[in-house]
Curated annotation (Swiss-Prot):
Any one Gene Ontology BP term: arginine biosynthetic process via ornithine
Protein name, per record: Putrescine carbamoyltransferase
Principal cellular location given in the protein's record: cytoplasm
Keywords linked to the UniProt accession: Cytoplasm, Polyamine biosynthesis, Transferase
């Protein structure tokens, strides 16, 4: 049996492994668009733990499991005892006997870490207060689909505009893993922490990428191939009132037509959604031909399929045809003999 692996943070995977996941996702997307649904996860069950409500994450995982022949169970907030009457570890141990893989969207990053450390099955981080690795993978797939003509991913520059959200941190992790140039254009007090920058630095040593944090719009946007933004509330600052939030970010950090004009002519706009129209991005940009936000949303599904197959298929393969034939025959005999009971 292969050693169990989890998808908690992309720092746990090499660039080559990430590229392999991307290739799996793109190949299955192509297959499904051509009408063939590979039944790679037949009879497998995904348990989905949600401490936060979600649209894209839940629908993407459920659809992915159905398309690949499996089944997903939604464990809603308040429906399970996660860290309450029952410890996180006990929940992980029990669910390990009932489902084949777990996905958890949690309030605290330590919760998904504890689930992974205790569960006997793979655990996927569906988002925490630290990072959003499934979004990272979907965004990487989207960037590969929209590479500027004549450029490789390593030649590209991505600029994250605004607050240091989980998605901002994850965008930097993925960009520097792939060898891209990453810039956060955001105000002091709302920039990525030193702990995030250390991971980016280690990634860059291997990949040849770069990272920069700046408040200078011209430096940030120069030659940008991709511009990304997220809502204006981030990883670690105290909750701001709407008035304080607008005063901090508006208008300098709003992605509008003027800001877009400072980037490369072929620039693409990205947003993880949901977006607050008129705040971090204008309608004009969000709905523009260069906006790829709906492609991003679709590629959440592409990423989920890739992750589920990457982490579960080795266990499926290990069973082998001989094992399947053995148990099919034994079950058929048992049921035949017991038919008269």
């Amino acid at each position: 049996m292969n050693k169990k692996r989890d998808f908690i943070d992309t720092k746990d995977f090499s660039k080559e492994e990430i590229l392999f996941m991307i290739e799996i996702g793109r190949k299955m997307k192509e297959s499904i668009k051509n009408g063939h649904y590979p039944q790679l996860l037949k009879h497998k069950t995904l348990g989905m733990i949600f401490e936060q409500s979600s649209t894209r994450t839940r629908v993407s995982f459920e659809t992915a499991m159905t398309q690949l022949g499996g089944h997903a169970q939604y464990l809603a907030p308040g429906q399970i005892q996660l860290g309450g009457h029952e410890s996180v570890g006990d929940t992980a141990k029990v669910l390990s006997r009932l489902v084949d893989i777990l996905m958890a969207r949690v309030e605290r990053h330590q919760t998904v870490v504890e689930l992974a450390n205790t569960a006997a099955i793979p655990v996927i981080n569906g988002m925490s207060d630290y990072n959003h690795p499934t979004q990272e993978l979907g965004d990487a797939i989207t960037m590969f689909e929209h590479l500027p003509k004549g450029k490789k991913i390593e030649d590209c520059k991505i600029v994250f505009v605004g607050d240091a959200t989980q998605v901002c941190a994850s965008t930097m992790f993925m960009a520097t893993k792939l060898g891209m140039d990453f810039v956060q254009f955001g105000p002091k007090g709302f920039q990525l922490r030193e702990e995030h920058l250390k991971i980016a630095e280690e990634n860059c040593k291997v990949s040849g990428g770069s990272y920069l944090i700046t408040e200078d719009v011209d430096i940030a946007l120069k030659d940008a191939d991709f511009i990304y933004t997220d809502v204006w509330y981030g990883l670690y600052e105290a909750e701001l009132s709407e008035e304080e939030r607008m005063k901090t970010f508006y208008p300098k950090y709003q992605v509008n037509k003027e800001l877009i004009s400072k980037a490369a002519p072929h620039v693409k706009f990205m947003h993880c959604l949901p977006a607050t129209r008129g705040e971090e991005v204008t309608d004009e940009v969000l709905d523009a031909p260069y906006s790829v936000v709906i492609d991003e949303a679709e590629n959440r599904l592409t990423a989920m399929r890739a992750l589920l197959v990457y982490f579960m298929n080795p266990y499926v393969r290990e069973a082998g045809f001989a094992v399947a034939e053995k148990y099919d025959a034994e079950l058929e005999l048992l049921l035949r003999n017991g038919a008269g009971l």
